[in-house]
From Swiss-Prot:
Keywords: Acyltransferase, Cell membrane, Cytoplasmic vesicle, Lipoprotein, Membrane, Palmitate, Transferase, Transmembrane, Transmembrane helix. It is an enzyme of class 2 (transferase). It is a multi-pass membrane protein. Its main location: membrane. The active site is at C146. PANTHER family: PALMITOYLTRANSFERASE ZDHHC16. Belongs to the DHHC palmitoyltransferase family. It is found in: Cell membrane; Cytoplasmic vesicle membrane. The lineage of its organism: Eukaryota, Viridiplantae, Streptophyta, Embryophyta, Tracheophyta. Its EC number is 2.3.1.225. The gene is PAT13. It catalyses: L-cysteinyl-[protein] + hexadecanoyl-CoA = S-hexadecanoyl-L-cysteinyl-[protein] + CoA. This is Probable protein S-acyltransferase 13. GO terms for cellular component: cytoplasmic vesicle membrane; plasma membrane.
Length: 302
């Protein structure tokens, strides 16, 4: 039997908002190293150094705003719960024998495309929804419960989560590149190039190491999720290693639109247009476009 890592997620409840404070602390420390210690004072030097500082600080602050906007959008947005009294269309068409349907309903993974029922919530489960042990409820198109945002990542906040990864990678890369000269000075033998205090130099060194580590790790995570979006699947669905035909892969363009929306002007902000909310039901996590059985293809694990 495969080891189910998700059953250990209940331990994440104890972390609570501590992780949010840790994220804010890392951002604050990085801000201190980049703005207060290095590129803020460089504005007063004049010449090329000042121009470079203006460019670095402008790019840094823009990415920081987008990062924080995306991050708190994931934190505060309800990922999507099953509406009270929701029932599959099959139950509406066949109003009799409800208890029989419940007894026959699948309680397994997403590979079952029939009626699904959650014994813990005592309610029907829409397609692609899963029960989160941390949140204690079923989440629409659940991807995973993220410790960094202290929230589930589901239908309503998956786009914000992907943008958080995207802007985190860009921001940490910019920070690492901008602090690289200070990192090299840290290991220099002479004292001629050192113009800051040992404490400021140490702060810059630690900030560089933190950001290069986050940039590399987030890059891998971002690439993985781009691959998932391209095939219209989630982390949980990939973990389940389906061998059945996967009907939700409706083409790369449509797959991305079901996450980011059809208006590409909004792809890089954690918002949807009102038009997309109306014409793309997949954004709500209850109704998904699917291909016919003859057109479907197997969903392979990553």
């Amino acid at each position: 039997m495969a080891w189910n890592v998700f059953k250990f997620c209940t331990a994440l409840r104890a972390l609570g908002s501590i992780m949010i404070l840790i994220v804010i602390g890392i951002i604050g420390f990085t801000y201190y190293a980049v703005v207060v210690v290095n590129y803020g004072p460089a504005l007063l030097i004049g010449g090329v150094d000042s121009l470079l500082s203006v460019l670095v600080l402008a790019f840094f602050h823009f990415l920081l705003i987008m990062l924080l906007w995306s991050y708190f959008s994931v934190v505060v947005t309800d990922p999507g719960g099953v509406p009270t009294g929701w029932r599959p269309e099959l139950d509406i068409e066949k109003s009799e024998g409800n208890q029989a349907l419940i007894g026959e309903a699948s309680v397994g993974d997403s590979s079952s495309h029939g009626v699904r029922y959650c014994r813990k919530c005592n309610q029907y489960k829409p397609p692609r929804s899963h029960h989160c042990s941390v949140c204690g409820r079923c989440i629409l198109k659940m991807d995973h419960h993220c410790v960094w945002v202290v929230n589930c990542v589901g239908a309503n906040n998956y786009k914000s989560f992907l943008l958080f990864l995207f802007y985190t990678f860009l921001e940490t890369t910019v920070v690492a590149v901008s602090l690289l000269p200070i990192f090299l000075v840290f290991f220099s033998d002479g004292d001629g190039d050192i113009t800051v205090s040992p404490g400021s130099l140490a702060a810059s060194f630690v900030a560089f190491v933190l950001n290069i580590a986050f940039a590399l790790s987030v890059l891998g995570f971002l690439i993985m999720h781009i691959m998932l979006v391209a095939r219209n699947t989630t982390t949980i669905e990939a973990y389940e290693k389906h061998t059945v035909n996967w009907p939700y892969n409706v083409g790369r363009k449509t797959n991305f639109e079901q996450v980011f929306g059809s208006d590409k002007m909004y792809w890089f902000v954690p918002l949807y247009t009102e038009d997309d909310k109306k014409k793309l039901p997949a954004l709500g996590g209850l109704d998904f476009t699917s291909r016919s059985e003859s057109e479907t293809e197997p969903l392979q694990s990553l």
